[in-house]
């Protein structure tokens, strides 16, 4: 340790310089050189002798010598690549300022660019110049004299012609203070220049404005110094002066301040010893002090030199050693060289950074290691590792607070979890917060660490710090998920702060959750929702509406009413999305639905919820009048929603609505199934009575089938009424009715007795009518036989005068038929599309009659061969055998075209099938062959009896079973033959 407490290290190695030509021999090139002044420039150092010689020594230890002055050399200074010198060439006082270009050598001497005579510039004194300083910009130069006079010039030092004349006197002569031993120039902003003047007794500073006027002068507290005991750093503007007791530090910018600057910062380095030389090299100050020699080997070795290298910023001694005899110190490039009295040259080589740091770490001097690493160019690579070791060192000693300060500096290198595990104990939570804060400031945190920090604040009760941290997050200076922050505030019951945070970041759902569920401020919640956009109002009301409806009913309903009035576009703002909150509160539901109905006329999207509400009411109390059903339910049902309404009605078992929807959709079958499922016979009968005529038959059959399976004796009266309706409708054959009802084991004969008796009476009447019809038909057949006989054996006179097709008088050529129809030839050809010789007017009637006959015979044949005749009859009944209305309708359709040559596409006979149709198409009922159109036939020819359907093919006798009603010619017309 030094006398003032600085630590001492050995960061330099002192080694003797050997001759580069003969490495085994020591370098003795500077032996017997008496160095009186020196300066360093680039990689070279210039050593000046008092006799005028200059030695140039490079950092590769190459030598060069030239004679700068013939008589004496007083001072050397380097600026840029140039060398400036002050000296005398003759015995008289005639000081010369020479500017050298060392890179340009002529005749073994550097080129002299300019030579300025300095004595004429100070005519009031005969003292020679002894000191010089030039600014590195080569725009200003200052020269000092032995009598204390100082001259200053501002301009281009290399080229200005006025350099020979226009100098400014900065300081007058002061013989009492002695000669000027040192000069320095500092250029400051605002065109100000500070000139430091060092004499043997004092240190002065002069402030010049625009390089012409001295505006300030200060005399500092240092006692002056010799020419080798001061140093100046132009980059920082700092002057360091070494006196016997102290080292003084003066800054150029402080000299401008009128209130300070006289007293400089000082350090007691080498106190009590004579200072021989002060040299600055980088961050180090090398100081040579004179000491009494403790080991005297020679007669002139009374004194020795102590070399000390200081790091002022780090406050430690980087190197120190004693040197026998007196020595000189100078800088060549970045190397410090020591020239001993006997001409031995030594160099101080700084150890590499890793070695220095290793030394410090081993000595646990981490603070110095940190400082050295910070001041080194490559120290950043080691800095975090040093802090980590320093932190571990302090943590091991129990100094957790200072240890965390070191761990802070390891962010980016040391895994945060390593540090956090050490400080998870509750007693160290304060230090953990410090580390996590730095981690967040460095933007190397994650969400988990943010949560830990906020929870640590809350656990300590540091609400202020917690909120400051939250504010930093919300201000954007920290990055974190707002939801995590919100959840932590909510966890530690900072409800107001949590709600404000959620509000600020538009976390509306979270804000309302705090306000309603935690703070229980329901009115505030309604107010909060009312200030949101309409879409958010609907969404938030749907989520929190139930609680608000319970605790702030009036406020909520009023808010909804206002929003509905303000937003009438039902397509964009569907308020029915929040209808679920009213479930269970029928009064509120009705009020809300009234709001919705008044909102817009186009409320299709609202109908289903409205219907649901009304059906819920119906389920509670089903005693509704038809008018109320119409007003509250039926009027809302339309084609778009009838399916959804039907499903809802089935869900709530709303029978009137189900009946209404199915009836309006003409879904009588589904309605029948619904009534059957409920086993409501009365409703089934009502349905059958109210349905259309087209559906009655099917519905009666469904009803009878249901009764046959599920009816009981208690339903006898209802069944009797049902049979009356069936009897009145005449839609179902009684045999089918009896067959379906016979399947029920519970019904008695009394249920169908009246129905059977009534049917039998009707059948008796029909039988009597059929008998009368048969008699009439037999009579007609007899008349028809006479007509046929007349046609076969008597001459026929054709007396038709008009065409049966165009109803105009006949003109030859004509075509006459035995059926009393006549046609123009061209009219006949128009209607005779198939080329046959049949009467167009009678052809359709004959075909239909023949089809009926064939179908009848086919039915008789099937009935005779059937094993179960009743089953066959029932099958044909289902096909409409006795459906007279259907027969008449289809017959009338077939007769629409009296000249149709083909059969109707759909037969009216229920016994028709493909086989019958084929047979009917191959048979003809016409017994006579017609003549060709070109030949008029006036009389009939005798037909072959074998082709006559009215005679037996074997005996030729007349058939006794001939049915006159099947004669296509009808009853015979009165004879017009005058010979009959």
From Swiss-Prot:
It is a peripheral membrane protein. One of its GO terms (molecular function) is zinc ion binding. Gene3D superfamilies: YVTN repeat-like/Quinoprotein amine dehydrogenase, Zinc/RING finger domain, C3HC4 (zinc finger). Residues 886-898 have a biased composition (Basic and acidic residues). Transmembrane segments: none annotated. Disruption phenotype: Increased numbers of germ cell corpses. Reduced number of gut granules in the adult intestine. Endosome/lysosome fusion defects in coelomocytes. Double knockout with either sorf-1 or sorf-2 results in larger endosomes and larger lysosomes and thus suppresses the endosome/lysosome fusion defects in coelomocytes in the vps-11 single mutant. RNAi-mediated knockdown results in a reduced number of gut granules in embryonic intestinal cells. InterPro entries: Clathrin_H-chain/VPS_repeat, VPS11, VPS11_C, WD40/YVTN_repeat-like_dom_sf, WD40_repeat_dom_sf, Znf_RING, Znf_RING/FYVE/PHD. The keyword Transcription does not apply. A zinc finger (RING-type) spans 803-843. Pfam families: PEP5_VPS11_N, TPR_PEP5_VPS11, VPS11_C. Residues 886-980 are annotated as: Disordered. Keywords: Endosome, Lysosome, Membrane, Metal-binding, Protein transport, Transport, Zinc, Zinc-finger. SUPFAM superfamilies: RING/U-box (SSF57850), WD40 repeat-like (SSF50978). PROSITE patterns: CHCR (PS50236), ZF_RING_2 (PS50089). One of its GO terms (cellular component) is CORVET complex. CHCR repeats lie at residues 407-554. Residues 917-937, 947-960 have a biased composition (Polar residues). It is found in: Late endosome membrane; Lysosome membrane. One of its GO terms (biological process) is regulation of vacuole fusion, non-autophagic. Plays a role in vesicle-mediated protein trafficking to lysosomal compartments including the endocytic membrane transport pathways. Believed to act as a core component of the putative HOPS and CORVET endosomal tethering complexes which are proposed to be involved in the rab-5-to-rab-7 endosome conversion probably implicating sand-1, and via binding SNAREs and SNARE complexes to mediate tethering and docking events during SNARE-mediated membrane fusion. Probable core component of at least two putative endosomal tethering complexes, the homotypic fusion and vacuole protein sorting (HOPS) complex and the class C core vacuole/endosome tethering (CORVET) complex. Their common core is composed of the class C Vps proteins vps-11, vps-16 and vps-18, which in HOPS further associates with vps-33.1, vps-39 and vps-41 and in CORVET with vps-8 and vps-33.2. Belongs to the VPS11 family. PANTHER family: VACUOLAR PROTEIN SORTING-ASSOCIATED PROTEIN (PTHR23323), VACUOLAR PROTEIN SORTING-ASSOCIATED PROTEIN 11 HOMOLOG (PTHR23323:SF24). This is Vacuolar protein sorting-associated protein 11 homolog. It comes from Caenorhabditis elegans. The lineage of its organism: Eukaryota, Metazoa, Ecdysozoa, Nematoda, Chromadorea.
């Amino acid at each position: 340790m030094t006398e003032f407490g600085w630590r001492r290290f050995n960061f330099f190695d002192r080694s003797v310089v050997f001759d580069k030509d003969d490495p085994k021999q020591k370098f003795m090139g500077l032996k017997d050189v008496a160095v009186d002044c020196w300066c360093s420039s680039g990689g070279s150092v210039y050593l000046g002798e008092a006799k005028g010689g200059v030695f140039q020594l490079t950092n590769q230890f190459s030598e060069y010598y030239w004679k700068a002055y013939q008589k004496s050399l007083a001072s050397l200074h380097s600026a840029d690549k140039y060398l400036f010198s002050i000296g005398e060439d003759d015995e008289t006082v005639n000081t010369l300022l020479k500017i050298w270009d060392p890179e340009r050598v002529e005749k073994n001497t550097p080129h002299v660019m300019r030579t300025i005579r300095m004595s004429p510039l100070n005519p009031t004194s005969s003292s020679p110049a002894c000191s010089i300083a030039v600014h590195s910009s080569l725009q200003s130069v200052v020269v000092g004299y032995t009598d204390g006079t100082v001259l200053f010039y501002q301009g281009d030092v290399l080229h200005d012609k006025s350099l020979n004349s226009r100098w400014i006197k900065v300081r007058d002569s002061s013989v009492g203070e002695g000669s000027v031993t040192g000069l320095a120039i500092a250029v400051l902003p605002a065109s100000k220049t500070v000139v430091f003047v060092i004499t043997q007794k004092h240190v002065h500073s002069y402030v010049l404005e625009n390089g012409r006027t001295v505006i300030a002068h200060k005399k500092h507290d240092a006692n002056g110094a010799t020419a080798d005991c001061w140093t100046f750093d132009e980059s920082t503007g700092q002057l360091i002066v070494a006196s016997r007791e102290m080292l003084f530090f003066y800054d150029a910018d402080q000299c401008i301040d009128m209130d300070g600057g006289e007293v400089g910062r000082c350090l007691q380095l080498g106190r009590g010893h004579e200072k021989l030389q002060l040299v600055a090299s980088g961050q180090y100050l090398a100081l040579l002090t004179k000491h009494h020699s403790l080991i005297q080997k020679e007669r002139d070795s009374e004194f020795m030199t102590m070399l000390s290298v200081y790091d002022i910023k780090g406050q430690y001694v980087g190197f120190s050693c004693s040197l026998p005899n007196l020595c000189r110190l100078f800088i060549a490039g970045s190397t410090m060289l020591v020239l001993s009295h006997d001409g031995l040259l030594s160099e101080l080589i700084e150890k590499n950074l890793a070695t220095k740091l290793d030394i410090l770490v081993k000595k646990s001097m981490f603070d110095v290691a940190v400082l050295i690493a910070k001041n080194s160019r490559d120290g950043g690579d080691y800095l975090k590792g040093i802090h980590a070791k320093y932190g571990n060192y302090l943590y091991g000693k129990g100094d957790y607070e200072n240890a965390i300060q070191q761990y802070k500096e390891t962010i980016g290198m040391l895994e945060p979890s390593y540090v956090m595990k050490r400080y998870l104990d509750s007693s160290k939570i304060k230090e953990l917060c410090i580390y996590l804060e730095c981690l967040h400031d460095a933007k190397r945190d994650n969400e988990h660490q943010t949560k830990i920090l906020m929870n640590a604040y809350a656990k300590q009760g540091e609400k202020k710090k917690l909120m400051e941290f939250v504010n930093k997050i919300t201000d954007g200076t920290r990055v974190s998920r707002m939801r995590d922050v919100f959840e932590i505030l909510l966890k530690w019951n900072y409800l107001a702060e949590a709600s404000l945070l959620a509000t600020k970041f538009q976390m509306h759902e979270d804000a309302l959750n705090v306000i309603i569920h935690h703070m229980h401020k329901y009115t505030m919640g309604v107010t909060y929702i009312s200030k949101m956009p309409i879409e958010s109002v609907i969404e938030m009301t749907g989520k929190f509406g139930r609680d608000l409806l319970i605790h702030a009913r009036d406020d909520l309903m009023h808010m909804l009413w206002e929003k509905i009035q303000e937003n009438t576009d039902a397509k964009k703002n569907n308020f029915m999305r929040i209808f679920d909150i009213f479930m269970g509160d029928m009064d509120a539901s009705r009020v809300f639905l009234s709001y919705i109905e008044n909102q817009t006329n186009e409320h299709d999207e609202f109908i289903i919820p409205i219907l649901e509400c009304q059906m819920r009411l119906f389920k509670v109390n089903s005693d509704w009048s038809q008018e109320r059903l119409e007003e509250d339910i039926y009027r809302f049902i339309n084609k778009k929603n009838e399916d959804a309404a039907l499903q809802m009605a089935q869900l709530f078992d709303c029978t009137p609505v189900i009946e209404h929807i199915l009836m309006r959709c003409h879904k009588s079958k589904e309605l029948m199934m619904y009534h059957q499922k409920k086993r409501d016979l009365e409703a089934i009968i009502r349905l059958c009575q109210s349905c259309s005529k087209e559906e009655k038959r099917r519905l009666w059959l469904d009803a009878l089938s249901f009764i046959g399976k599920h009816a009981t004796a208690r339903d006898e009266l209802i069944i009797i009424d049902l049979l009356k309706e069936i009897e009145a409708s005449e839609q179902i054959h009684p045999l089918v009715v009896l067959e379906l009802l016979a399947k029920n084991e519970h019904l008695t004969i009394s249920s169908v007795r009246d129905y059977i008796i009534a049917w039998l009476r009707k059948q008796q009447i029909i039988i009597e009518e059929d008998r009368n019809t048969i008699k009439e038909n037999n009579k007609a057949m007899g008349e028809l036989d006479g007509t046929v006989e007349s046609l076969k054996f008597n001459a026929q006179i054709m007396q038709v005068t008009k065409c049966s097709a165009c109803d105009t008088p006949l003109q030859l050529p004509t075509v006459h038929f035995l059926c009393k129809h006549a046609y123009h030839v061209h009219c006949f050809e128009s209607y005779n599309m198939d080329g046959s010789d049949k009467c167009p007017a009678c052809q359709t009637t004959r075909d239909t009659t023949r089809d009926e006959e064939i179908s009848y015979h086919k039915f008789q044949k099937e009935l005779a061969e059937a094993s179960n005749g009743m089953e066959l009859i029932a099958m044909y009944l289902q096909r409409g055998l006795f459906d007279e209305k259907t027969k008449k309708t289809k017959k009338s359709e077939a007769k629409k075209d009296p000249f149709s040559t083909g059969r109707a596409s759909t037969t009216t006979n229920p016994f028709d099938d493909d086989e019958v149709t084929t047979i009917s198409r191959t048979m003809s009922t016409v017994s006579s062959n017609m003549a060709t159109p070109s030949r008029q036939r006036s009389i009939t020819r005798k037909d072959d009896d074998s082709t006559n359907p009215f005679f037996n093919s074997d005996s030729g006798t007349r058939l006794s079973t001939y049915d006159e009603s099947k004669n296509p010619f009808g009853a015979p017309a009165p004879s017009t033959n005058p010979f009959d």
